[in-house]
Amino acid sequence: MSVNLASQLREGTKKSHSMAENVGFVKCFLKGVVEKNSYRKLVGNLYFVYSAMEEEMAKFKDHPILSHIYFPELNRKQSLEQDLQFYYGSNWRQEVKISAAGQAYVDRVRQVAATAPELLVAHSYTRYLGDLSGGQILKKIAQNAMNLHDGGTAFYEFADIDDEKAFKNTYRQAMNDLPIDQATAERIVDEANDAFAMNMKMFNELEGNLIKAIGIMVFNSLTRRRSQGSTEVGLATSEG
């Protein structure tokens, strides 16, 4: 019997989604204010997070639950490697360092995989649906804000997915068809909210560099008004 997990996740993470949209770094990004050094640090953190998540998902590709949402065409690790080479150069593996919040996120993904792998559903949902929902819009914002012409936005490009909207529907249906009970669904929703919180901590770490670049007065003017969470653009968070 279906527990309509996709709907439960959408409803159960609405507050977290709104909170994520109101982090200063995200609000500035959505308004077209992106500081390159802060952004490349975010790309670095995402590289470590996706590397961990995709490694663990691959381990469980035959899992009775996770096998239903194992879509390697979603994988972002290689795209992030392209972007890191763009921002840091060929020596990027020696240059990129994970932040404290990024490490906490990776540690949680590893812990879940080791103790309750079904909760990886929450991390997959939180990351990939956001990527699919706002990818093209966020790509254009990044290109315009940082004057990018020849790279730096591979993260937002899904070369192996022809129709992103149709794929999102397929993904949601796969979540709804997962062989889980209501108690497990509730644990997945709780984990998704925790994933949102971990994303927000990564964003908060970046605000110092952004403020130094644009000034506190500009930052405050851009972040003063609270968003109502109506947009489906998810900067590294699910569509909500």
Curated annotation (Swiss-Prot):
SUPFAM superfamilies for the chain: Heme oxygenase-like
Chain positions recorded as heme b binding sites: R10, H17, Y125, K168, R172
UniProt KW Plastid keyword: no
Gene3D superfamilies for this protein: Heme oxygenase-like
Molecular function terms, GO-annotated: heme binding; heme oxygenase (decyclizing) activity; metal ion binding
Pfam families per the UniProt record, alphabetical: Heme_oxygenase (PF01126)
Catalytic activity entry: heme b + 3 reduced [NADPH--hemoprotein reductase] + 3 O2 = biliverdin IXalpha + CO + Fe(2+) + 3 oxidized [NADPH--hemoprotein reductase] + 3 H2O + H(+)
Enzyme class: oxidoreductase
Gene Ontology annotations of biological process type: heme catabolic process; heme oxidation; photosynthesis; response to oxidative stress
Highest taxon listed in the record's lineage: Bacteria
InterPro entries in the record: Haem_Oase, Haem_Oase-like, Haem_Oase-like_multi-hlx, Haem_oxygenase_CS
UniProt keyword annotation of Cytoplasm present: no
EC number, as in UniProt: 1.14.14.18
Swiss-Prot/TrEMBL keywords: Heme, Iron, Metal-binding, Oxidoreductase, Photosynthesis
Family in the record: Belongs to the heme oxygenase family.
Primary role: Catalyzes the opening of the heme ring with the release of iron. Key enzyme in the synthesis of the chromophoric part of the photosynthetic antennae.
PANTHER family noted in UniProt: HEME OXYGENASE
Protein name, entry field: Heme oxygenase 1
Gene: pbsA1
